[in-house]
Structures are given as structure tokens and as C-alpha cells.
Amino acid sequence: EDWDQVATDDGYIGYIQKKKVSAADTTDYKRSFKAEAYSYFTMDEPVNLAWHQVTSTDANNYFADTTQNMTGVNVISPTWFSVSDNDGNVSSLASGEYVMQAHEKGLKVWGLVDNFSENMSTTTVLSNTAARQNLENQLVTYALKAGLDGINVDFESLSEDVGIHFLQFLRELSIQCHENNLVLSVDNPVPEDFTSHYDRAEQGKVVDYVIIMGYDEHYVGSDAGSVASLPWVEQGVKDTLAEVPAKRTILAIPFYTRLWKTTEGGALTSEAIGMDQAQQ
């Protein structure tokens, strides 16, 4: 009872007489750490965006014809960039003339980059620091050369193992974008349990806009059904807004539907058709 068990800083345990133990000495430490404050490039008005499918440089020449009857849109996103190989190189269809014409019509231009090439692995590119940063550098260089207002990231069918690398890519790209006055947006599928690795909450901290791809509820190979039923879309919006501020969330809606047919052999087929054709 006259002894106290004590331990040294390096782990040795022993005993010392109580009378030789002084009162406890308490030191209060103040935290100097400050959480990082993020700033965002957002528009003063709601974003009304239209994606423009561009598959060749010649297609850029038809910008005026393509947009002559377009109303209500303030951002156009041409599909100009694609990751072409595992070194993070980018193929580009960008056109400064296209951007100039869009600006004359009062449109902002966000160049889209996809991961659709069969010659690259998204996991390989994004998990490799050199390849990932090469991708980021090329995107920003192309964007500045063409006079773009922003970059739209459309990386689809991401596996669970690439989730953390995708987020790191967005973090790094957002820094470069903001240093060069470029808006950064990212496309996401409607939230489901199997897409939780997209981590929309973390995305919402670093990108300017999170876009919900509110379509493909039913698709080729699935059961017959709506491309985007109202309850399904509403739930997707609700789940996204639980993680991302509403003012930086965009809902993308489909201007197409699917025509479902059953063959004589009983097989279910479907064909994507535009709204004009669907009305016929």
C-alpha cells in the first residue's frame, strides 16, 4: 500500500514509494490546426447544360446548325477529350473556333473527358501518380488552349477498387482547375448501394458541380421498363442532396426512351430512340 506502480516513457514498469510521487502535472495544449476552407466556382443562375456529342473535328464546324434552335441552355459540354492510354495521355477534338462561337451565343463551354477507350484501364491510370498527373496536366493545357470555361469528368463504370484513386484525381484536378479559373464538374450515376465508392460527399467537397445522370434505370439486357421513372429519379435526387449542397447539384434528364420488343422466339430486345421518333 506504500508503493505505486509506475512506467517509464520507453515501457519499463516498476514500483516507487508513494511519498516520493509528486502531484500530477497537467499541461493544456491548444490546437492550432484549421480545417481547409474550400471555395467554388459557381454560376449566379441555375445551370442549364446540354451535352453535345462530337466524334470528329469536322463535327465542330456544325456548331451553328446544331444549336440554332436551342433555347434555355447556358452551358454546352462537347465530348472532346478521352483518356487514350495507360500513361494518362489525352486525345482531343477541341476547337477554339467552336468556343468562340459558343461565347458569342452567351454559352459557357465545359469540355467533357471520358474513360471509354479500350486502350486504357481507368484503375491503371488513376492509381499511378505519374499517369494521373499527366492526365490532369494535359486536360488543363487543352482547356486553356481552346479557351474553355470548365471541364466535365465523365468516367463511367468505375469498379470499387478505383474509387479512392478517382477521388484523388478529382482533388488534384480541382486545384489545377481553380488555379486557372476553370469550373470542374463530375458525372455520377443515380446513387445505389453498389456505387457508394463514388463517394459523392467527398466529391462535393472538391468539385464545383456534381451531376446526377438521371437515366438508364432500365437498359439493354435488363427487364423492360422506363429509362427514368419519376420515383426512381426523385429518390436519386434526394439521396444526392443528402451528401451534396443543392446549389452545386445538377440533375441530367434523358431526351430519349427505349422501344421494347419481344421477338418471335421470346427474346426481349430494346432500341434507344429520340423524343421526336418516340412521338411518331
Model-derived features: where do they sit?
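Catalytic domains of carbohydrate-active enzymes, especially glycoside hydrolases
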Residues: A59-N86, L139-I151
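Substrate-binding surface in catalytic domains of secreted glycosidases
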Residues: N86, N137, E160-Q279
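Substrate-binding cleft of extracellular glycoside hydrolase catalytic domains
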Residues: M100-I151, F155-E156, H178
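Surface-exposed, active-site-proximal loop segments in enzymatic domains
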Residues: D85-S92, S117-Q133, V162, A224-G225
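Aromatic-lined substrate-binding rim segments of carbohydrate-active enzymes
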Residues: A37, D85-D114, L158-S185
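Conserved beta-strand/loop element in small beta-rich adapter and peptidoglycan-binding domains
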Residues: E1-D2
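Boundary regions of SH3-family modules and the immediately adjacent low-complexity/disordered segments
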Residues: A7-P46
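Hydrophobic faces of well-ordered beta-strands that scaffold small-molecule active sites
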Residues: N48-H52, N74-P78, L107-V113, I151-V153, ...
